[in-house]
Amino acid sequence: MKMHSSLTTLCALLWLVSAGRAANTGSAFYGDAPDEHHPWAVHDRNRPQPKLVTPGTFSSPEQPGKPPSDAVVLFDGTDLSKWEADEGSGVPTKWVIKDGAMECVPHSGYIRTRESIGDCQLHVEWAAPSRVEGESQGRGNSGVFMMGLVEIQVLDDYNNPTYADGFAAAVYGQNPPLANALRPPGEFQSYDIVFRRPIFKDGRELDPGWVTVFENGVLVQDHTRLEGPTGHGARSKPGPFPEAGPLKLQDHGNPVRYRNIWYRPLPPRAIEGGTDGYLSVEATQVKRQQIAAVIRQDAEKLADPANPLPQLLRLAESLVYDADGDALEKTAQLANEYLANLQQLPADKLEARKDQIKHLRDVCNYLVRFNVIPADAEQRAEIEQIIKDHNWDQKKK
C-alpha cells in the first residue's frame, strides 16, 4: 500500500468526525487550496476569526458619538492628559478645554499626542469659529497631521473659495478633496481617516502609503497615494517614514475647536509581515509551514489507538499547507489502520458508511487536484471500486 494512497482514505472521515468542528467555520478540503501567494485556502476553517468589536454611535453636530470598543481615545472632552505642546516632550499645551472641546489658543503653537501612532483609522471632529472672519486660507484654518508629517487640511470652506489642494480634507498641497461636504461654520464637522504610511527598505520604496478620508460621511479622499510629507509651496518628495509618530493639530492663528478624537491601530500589510492579502512567495511558504505545524499539534492531541480516524483527518488537513515528510508517513500509518478496519466490515455496516465513503472519494479528488496525492493512488482506485461494486452512484428511479 502506497503512503500517498493511504493518505487519501484518511480524508474521507472529515465528513463524519470533523463535521461538528466545521459546522460553523467551514469544512476542510472545500475551497481552493493555498497557493504560492495565499497561505490560506478559500473559505479556510483554520483562518483566524475576526475579532469582536462593539460598534460605537454616530455623531451629530450637536452631540459627539461613542467610539467603538477597541478604540484608543485621545480626547473625550474632559482633559488633555494625552497631549502636549509641540515644543518638546512633557511641555504642557496652552490649548484650553471649553464645553467638551479643546480649543486652539491662537499663536500658542501646535499640539501633539504624547504617544506615537502609526497606521490607523482616525476619527476627529472639528469646528471653525461661528463668527466668520477672514477669507481663503485665513478663515478657520488648522490641520490634522498624521504622524506629524501628512496634513489633512482643516479649513472653513463654507462659501469660501481657495486653492483646490488647500480645501478642507485636502492632502495639503498634494491632492484636493473629491467634494466640499462641509457644514456651516460653528457646527462640528467629522473626519474619518484611514492612513497607511510609506514603507521603504534599503532606500527602495515598497509602498508609497495611502490615505482615505470621509468628511461628514462623504468620501473625499479615495485611497490617495502619498507623495511624501506635505508642505507649503514646494512639491512634496517621497521618502521613508518612521514606523510611528505623534498626531499633531495645527495652530494657524484661528480658534478652531476639536472633540471626540480616537483611533484604531491597523494590522500590518503583507509587505511588512501581515498574513492577509497577496503575499510574496517566501512569506506565503513560511506562513503555510506555520499553519501546518499548528494543525499537526492539534492532530497529536486526537491520538486514540482505538479510533485513529480523528487524528488521521486532522493530520491529512495539514498536508494541504505543507507536505511534511513525517506527517505524510504518520498519515499513511493511520490510513492503513483505518482501511484495515474498513475491509473487515460486514456488508450491512459497510452500506451504513456509504455517504462517508463517497465523501472520501470527493476528498481524494480534492487532494489530487491540488497535487497533494498522485492521481494513481491505490486507495483512490479502491474507493472507486467499492462505490462501483455497490452501485452507490446509481440514481434511484
Task: Label the predicted regions.
Residues 1-10:
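Bacterial N-terminal signal peptides that target proteins for export
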Residues 23-397:
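Carbohydrate-interacting regions of secretory-pathway proteins
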Residues 9, 15, 39-41:
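A general, composition-driven signal for non-globular sequence regions
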